[in-house]
């Protein structure tokens, strides 16, 4: 534990129940608890059952879990119906929890809610509790979402986004059938323009954003400062960076026994993956992972497979079993000498491994954060929403990788993938990128070290709550 004086404060952490959301907010909870504030994680019954014994055995009463929603019978419920049901039931339970914690902590309570659950802020304010929106996306993405949300409402921004930002239209391209959902092509917003209904659903997180008492981002100051992103956001909101929210053993090593995220929705095959990497030379393996929500066509999977087959490097590909069925016949057998394909693997352990040369990623924010923190160059293959925005920053602002160019029909061809891998692994550009990511690795650790920007911001949050 930190040597900071005990504070009689209660931080209620309320994540959305996806793995990426849960992991980052749990790491934030650990940092808060390590500094001797009390944390309650309000989550679903299934998540509580998975995590409760492990978390509470490690943290005692510093971190407790409170189940506020029974999701045990949801397997056959459609996504939108499930979200509506979750909001209705969890809202009532969250309200009761806030009342209870206010009494126990003498009003020194803060609700840290997932930015994708904006209704939680309204409930907090109804009970006189301050609310901090915690975003699983980058600061640049939320700035873009906010700007686009204002546009859909027919409002103009007082200050335009800095020039470094890509056009707002970028996040509306290539919106796929996410999680197998099908959306109508377009709906009309208040400003009379047509938008993807999935985009409008995502933009709901901005509906009461200006009322939030604090905005928290899984980044660090040095990463947000280029392009004046932090400066622009700070003109509108109270913003603090508190990242990277990684297990301490992988970065600053200040928190004893903090060795993993603590929540996994998948069964991870650690041994075969790491043993295979151990057998490979340093910087000889391309790691490919596109997250849990990306679904590619058979044609696109074939292009990726043929690119990996024709390029000379070893590769490790984490690809879900449903996606493996789209691969060319005998691909695994034909590439067995240089490739390993698993349905999932321990990404933190993979990215810190000395055999990894680069990371082919869909540009989910957690993946980018991990790659930057571990100094791994990236080949960005973004699809939709925040991914193109973050890919733009990876290449154009942070100099940490390159982005594939798509054909006119949206396909990433095998030749393009091979070309990008060659640029990323060999030559002057590769050396420039390696130097940049090495710098970001150092800065990420410095942010969490004692007195670093994120470390200080977490202290300031606790002091702020103790002043209520």
Curated annotation (Swiss-Prot):
Entry's transmembrane regions: none
Protein name: UDP-glucosyl transferase 74CD1
Domain of life: Eukaryota
Ligand binding (UDP-alpha-D-glucose): 20, 292, 344, 347, 362, 365-367, 370, 386-387
Pathway: Secondary metabolite biosynthesis; terpenoid biosynthesis
Entry function: Component of the oleanane-type triterpene saponins (e.g. saponarioside A and saponarioside B) biosynthetic pathway, leading to the production of natural products with detergent properties used as traditional sources of soap.
Tissue expression summary: Mainly expressed in flowers, flower buds and young leaves, and, to a lesser extent, in old leaves, stems and roots.
Uses in industry and biotechnology: Soapwort saponins possess anticancer properties and are also being explored as enhancers for endosomal escape in targeted tumor therapies. They may also serve as precursors for vaccine adjuvants.
Gene: UGT74CD1
CDD domains registered for this protein in UniProt: GT1_Gtf-like
Catalytic residues as annotated in Swiss-Prot or TrEMBL: 21 (proton acceptor), 114 (charge relay)
Keywords (A to Z) from UniProt: Glycosyltransferase, Transferase
Protein source organism: Saponaria officinalis
């Amino acid at each position: 534990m930190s040597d900071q004086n005990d504070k009689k404060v209660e931080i209620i952490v309320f994540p959305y129940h996806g793995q990426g959301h849960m992991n980052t907010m749990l790491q934030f909870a650990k940092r808060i608890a390590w500094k001797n504030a009390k944390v309650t994680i309000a989550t679903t019954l299934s998540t509580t059952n998975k995590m409760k014994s492990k978390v509470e055995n490690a943290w005692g009463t510093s971190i407790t879990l409170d189940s506020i929603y029974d999701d045990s019978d949801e397997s056959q419920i459609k996504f939108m119906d499930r979200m509506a049901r979750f909001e209705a039931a969890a809202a009532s339970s969250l309200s009761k929890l806030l009342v209870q914690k206010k009494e126990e902590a003498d009003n020194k309570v803060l609700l840290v809610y997932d930015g994708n659950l904006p209704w939680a802020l309204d409930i907090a304010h109804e009970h006189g509790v301050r609310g901090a929106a915690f975003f699983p996306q980058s600061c640049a993405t939320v700035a873009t979402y906010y700007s686009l949300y204002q546009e859909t409402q027919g409002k103009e921004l007082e200050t335009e986004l800095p020039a470094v930002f890509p056009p707002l239209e970028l996040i509306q391209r290539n919106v796929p059938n996410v999680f197998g959902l099908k959306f109508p092509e377009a709906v009309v917003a208040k400003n009379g323009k047509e938008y993807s209904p999935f985009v409008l659903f995502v933009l709901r997180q901005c509906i009461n954003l200006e009322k939030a008492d604090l905005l928290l981002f899984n980044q660090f100051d040095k990463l947000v400062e280029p392009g004046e992103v932090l400066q622009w956001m700070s003109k509108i909101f109270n913003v603090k960076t508190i990242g990277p929210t990684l297990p301490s053993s992988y970065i600053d090593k200040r928190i004893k026994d903090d060795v993993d995220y603590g929540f996994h929705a998948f069964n991870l095959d650690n041994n075969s993956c790491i043993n295979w990497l151990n057998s490979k030379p340093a910087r000889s393996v391309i790691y490919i992972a596109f997250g849990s929500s990306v679904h590619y066509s058979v044609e696109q999977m074939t292009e990726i497979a043929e690119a990996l087959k024709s390029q000379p490097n070893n590769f490790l590909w984490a690809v879900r079993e449903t996606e493996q069925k789209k691969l060319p016949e005998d691909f695994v057998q034909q590439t067995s000498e240089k490739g390993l394909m698993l349905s999932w693997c321990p990404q933190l352990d993979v990215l810190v491994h000395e055999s990894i040369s680069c990371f082919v990623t869909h540009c989910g924010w957690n993946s980018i954060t991990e790659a930057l923190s571990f100094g791994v160059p990236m080949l960005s293959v973004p699809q939709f929403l925040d991914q193109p925005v973050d890919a733009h920053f990876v290449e154009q602002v942070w100099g940490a990788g390159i982005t594939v160019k798509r054909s006119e029909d949206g396909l990433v061809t095998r030749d393009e993938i091979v070309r990008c891998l060659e640029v990323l692994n060999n030559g002057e550009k590769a050396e420039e990128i390696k130097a940049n990511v090495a710098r970001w690795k150092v800065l990420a650790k410095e942010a969490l070290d004692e007195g670093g920007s994120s470390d200080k911001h977490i202290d300031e949050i606790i002091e702020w709550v103790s002043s209520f």
